[in-house]
């Protein structure tokens, strides 16, 4: 292997220097300047004799120790620029001089001799750096560097106490670039301890920014008033429009109709004082307070009037309209249930009787009462109930229409006109059930032949009956599952460790039986 010249060694890159050191059998994991020195000593041992500061590894370690001691005393550099070492770039060896300059400035001695020395050293370093680009370093430069490093180490030892007392803010000069700063956090932190804030002042300042409760309540009330007034206006307008639509749809005569009460079946109207036949009808005599204009907007009158007042008289046999269940005989009508305290009496089942000594009265024109003269309509009398008469048969009870509402017509009796002896009675159809004591309502004896002759209300089963208890398939499995679901339908059964252990034991038993059966040639299910 050919030894490269000194100029070639200085011109090589760091990676090439490492490769060269590996081939020469030297340690390659060194810094660039140390690696270059080691290669020079290896290839040119005469340079070792020329350089008195290189004593094997001891001189290198001495310079390293000096450099490390200087770096510890130095303040951290602020610049973060790293220079790229190119092919033509040579490693700098005079990195001690800016440290000397920085130390002399930071100490601040103020002597002219130190300032002149630093100027001279700067000029010499500039000249030396120019010479190094052309030729390798000489022995004189190395002697000077060594003497300078010794002087600076002495000065640093005497001035370390003064530097520690100074603050980091006093450091004005910028150190040499190209090195990553160490312990930058220590220099940036101020030495003063953090004081606790005055929370009272902070709370007072925050409280002054806040709004008072009175102002907030006033603002809230104004907002609520504006919102509620707009909502109220909209409600009133919608109600008014709905009322006007309802009035347009229905005529005035149909706005208010008398409510037909079931209590007026057996009660009569109050006697009227003699009225002329030329009286205005009731729908025209309605007072002004019931008119649509005078009605309150907030009064909600719904147009729905129920026609069915009780559920006992509703027709729930919907199959009569659809005719889809005619093949079944279970839909034969049964008579309505009768109460034991009432007797169902129809006008056809009783003879008519006249009311004695009934005087004629002028009929009042109303919506619920019809005035009939004797010439236009035959007289109809109130039926009387016989005490010993039994209950009406179901066939007669069927004839009464259960879906119609009863028109409450009453007999008007008046004795103000004694000169009229004729009788005027409004038509009356008494379909209500009269009360009677429960003692007279006795149950009849059961007639077996009559019940057998009646058709069945259901479809009987035809064919062979299944055996008793034979319909259940998989009895044990289904019952077991159902019982578990019944007991734990809200809390499902969670698998515990014991359950898993039992299951594992069962699986092992099954596997053992299967292996034994296969070994003996017995098929195991």
From Swiss-Prot:
Key words, A-Z: Cell cycle, Cell division, Cytoplasm, Cytoskeleton, DNA-binding, Meiosis, Microtubule, Mitosis, Nucleus
Keyword Kinase (UniProt): no
Biased composition (Basic and acidic residues): 160-169, 495-514
Ranges of biased composition (kind: Basic residues): 82-92
Keyword Nucleus (UniProt): yes
Primary localization class, coarse: cytoplasm
Subcellular location(s) per record: Cytoplasm; Nucleus; Cytoplasm, Cytoskeleton, Spindle
Subunit structure: Interacts with DNA. Interacts with microtubules, ipo7, kpna2 and kpnb1. Microtubule stabilization is inhibited by ipo7 and kpna2, while microtubule bundling is inhibited by kpnb1. Active GTP-bound ran causes dissociation of ipo7 and kpnb1.
Protein name according to UniProt: Nucleolar and spindle-associated protein 1-A
Organism from which the protein derives: Xenopus laevis (African clawed frog)
Species lineage: Eukaryota, Metazoa, Chordata, Craniata, Vertebrata
Gene that this polypeptide is encoded by: nusap1-a
